[in-house]
């Protein structure tokens, strides 16, 4: 599990494989710039990342990119069995969007 902290009050606990899948999708679809690719490794190596503690412009770009990718992925996934890998992925994406809706 990784901890992605958006601010002092909001933290997204996400399975590492879900974060990797979303992050790679965001990179591949241009929702995250390639210059942000290192943050996937930073989060993986450190058990997460606190967006509060990094450069605000980088934190904003990561939040916007991951939210855009999550929204697109939810549309693509449609209705999936919650007991599958896609179901876990979908539930995690929905939680990301809920936690970061007003950032």
Question: What do the predicted segments below correspond to?
Answer:
Residues 1-103:
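Acidic (Asp/Glu-rich) sequence patches and key acidic residues
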């Amino acid at each position: 599990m990784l901890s992605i902290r958006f601010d002092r009050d909001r933290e997204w606990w996400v399975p590492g494989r879900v974060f990797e899948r979303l992050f790679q999708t965001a990179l591949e679809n241009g929702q995250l710039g390639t210059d942000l690719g290192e943050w996937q490794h930073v989060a993986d190596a450190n058990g997460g990342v606190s967006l509060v503690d990094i450069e605000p412009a980088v934190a904003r770009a990561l939040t916007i990119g991951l939210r855009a990718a999550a929204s697109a992925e939810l549309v693509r996934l449609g209705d999936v069995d919650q007991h599958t890998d896609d179901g876990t992925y979908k539930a995690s994406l929905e939680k990301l969007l809920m936690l970061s809706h007003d950032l």
